[in-house]
Design a protein with these regions (language model features):
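P-loop (Walker A) phosphate-binding loop of NTP-binding proteins
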Residues: 14-17
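ATP-dependent small-molecule kinase phosphotransfer cores
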Residues: 36-96
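A glycine- and Lys/Arg-enriched "phosphate-lid" helix/loop adjacent to the NTP-binding pocket
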Residues: 99-140
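Walker A/P-loop
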Residues: 20
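Hydrophobic anchor at the beta1->P-loop junction of P-loop NTPases
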Residues: 11
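ATP/NTP phosphate-donor binding region
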Residues: 170-239
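NTP-dependent small-molecule kinase module
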Residues: 2-4, 29, 139-178
Length: 239
């Protein structure tokens, strides 16, 4: 993860997830420019990605993708990038992303196919291979991500970036989008014992917990305005 003071935001995700939209939203929040790697590759090669696949093959495209992506990641002035959906297939790119702030734009398979079919994308020609790629890539996106953002929130990245400020290394943010409102859910080892509290979230602190968990963290998140104790078990859980 990059330093929260000078973050470089890298948007990853499957085809049709809204990576370019998210990159523009992040760039606006950080007052900088977004770079779409696929568009830059087209400029460098002088032809569309569709033509590169048809005339030169996927291998040529992947070589250019890796070269251009690594070049951008080596330059700190490029603060917001949108990668192609398959860029994470490169081990070199995955290694380079370890030091960046990675946002995974998570789109469900049905929505991705609906957005991509008939668009001319070379890897969205048939549903079977499309679904196979989706299933292959999903665990890689999840492993690389510092934040997981639903694709329907790709145009509202500023609050996600605020929620990640000060996040301890190795932790993740899942951005929950609900009918009643959006909020960050935090995952990470020993977050409670570190007394982590997002600086972007003000106001009074309340803890909602069950009896089994509460006894292990009697003073977590102090000072608290109050505690709400619920019965342990699945019957007490809601989304």
């Amino acid at each position: 993860m990059a330093s929260p003071l000078t973050p470089r935001v890298v948007c990853i995700g499957f085809m049709g997830a809204g990576k370019s939209t998210a990159a523009r939203s992040a760039a606006a929040a950080l007052r900088t420019d977004a770079i779409d790697v696929d568009q830059l590759i087209e400029q460098r090669l002088g032809k569309s990605i569709e033509r590169v696949f048809a005339e030169d093959g996927e291998g040529t495209f992947r070589e250019a993708e890796e070269r251009v992506t690594l070049e951008l990641l080596e330059r700190p002035q490029h603060r917001v990038l949108a990668l192609g959906g398959g860029a994470i297939g490169s081990q070199a790119i995955r290694d380079a992303l370890r030091d960046e702030l990675v946002l995974w734009l998570d789109v469900d398979l049905g929505s991705a196919w609906e957005r991509c079919q008939g668009s001319g994308r070379p890897l969205a020609q048939d549903r079977e291979s499309f679904e196979r790629r989706y299933k292959q890539r999903e665990p890689i996106y999840a492993a690389l991500a510092d934040a997981i953002v639903p694709s329907q929130r790709s145009d509202a990245i500023a609050p996600v970036l605020e929620a990640m400020h000060g996040l301890p290394p190795g932790s993740k943010v899942l951005w929950a989008a609900t009918a009643s409102g959006d909020y960050p859910a935090y995952f990470g080892s020993a977050l409670l014992s570190r007394n982590f509290w997002p600086p972007a979230i003000g106001g009074r602190r309340f803890m909602v917990t069950d009896g089994h968990v509460a006894r292990h963290y009697p003073s977590a998140l102090e000072p608290l305005a109050g505690r709400v104790m619920i019965m342990p078990g699945e019957q007490s859980k809601t989304v």
